[in-house]
Curated annotation (Swiss-Prot):
Keywords: Cytoplasm, Elongation factor, Protein biosynthesis. Belongs to the elongation factor P family. SUPFAM superfamilies: Nucleic acid-binding proteins (SSF50249), Translation proteins SH3-like domain (SSF50104). GO terms for molecular function: translation elongation factor activity. PROSITE patterns: EFP. Involved in peptide bond synthesis. Stimulates efficient translation and peptide-bond synthesis on native or reconstituted 70S ribosomes in vitro. Probably functions indirectly by altering the affinity of the ribosome for aminoacyl-tRNA, thus increasing their reactivity as acceptors for peptidyl transferase. It comes from Streptococcus thermophilus (strain ATCC BAA-250 / LMG 18311). The gene is efp. This is Elongation factor P.
Length: 186
């Protein structure tokens, strides 16, 4: 059992009514009057829906034991993404709604990890950084580096990130998958 005050982003837990929830954001909130509460943004792992809620810090939940296996992203068809276990060659179908954030960072044949809760496939874990190619960005303007504000760039997966002014279309970039931000040129 884990207390609500110990839940952090990325953790998965089971509620008293059996829902499997993943913490997207968690923060302590102390109103002017009253007791401290934990405000959380959660994703229902099975349905993919996200919602905001709050819990008392002392509320207890069962921490979900999540196992991972190495896999490869194969392709997406309609509203389903297909993955293959690289050890057993078993294939898994995951609804896109459950992995839409992760799909922004991976291309076909990318290595990932499939997450299981018991025998149930619940998600995908992507590497901490990935290399993606810029498909579209504004041209560099001479002397624009003075402001240092950057410019938006569309990557080959459709992800849009803010990049420095010297980045041009066709360049490979290293992207931080946890924050969805530019790290460096590859």
């Amino acid at each position: 059992m884990i207390e609500a005050s110990k839940l952090r982003a990325g953790m998965t837990f089971v509620t008293n009514d059996g829902k499997l929830l993943k913490v997207l954001e968690a923060s302590h909130h102390k109103p002017g009057k009253g007791n401290t509460i934990m405000r959380m943004k959660l994703r229902d792992v099975r349905s993919g829906s996200t919602f905001d809620t709050s819990y008392r810090p002392e509320e207890k939940f069962e921490q979900a034991i999540i196992e991972t296996v190495p896999a490869q992203y194969l392709y997406q068809m309609d509203d389903t993404a297909y993955f293959m276990n690289t050890e057993t060659y078993d294939q898994y179908e995951i609804p896109v709604v459950n992995v839409q954030e992760e799909l922004k960072f991976i291309l076909e044949n990318s290595d990932v990890k499939i997450q299981f809760y018991g025998t149930e496939v619940i998600g995908v874990q992507v590497p901490t950084t990935v290399e993606l190619t810029v498909t579209e960005t504004q041209p560099s303007i001479k002397g624009a580096t003075v402001t240092g504000s950057g410019k938006p760039a569309t990557l080959e997966t459709g992800l849009v990130v803010n990049v420095p002014d010297f980045i041009e279309a066709g360049q490979k970039l290293v992207i931080n998958t946890a924050e969805g931000t530019y790290v460096s040129r590859a």
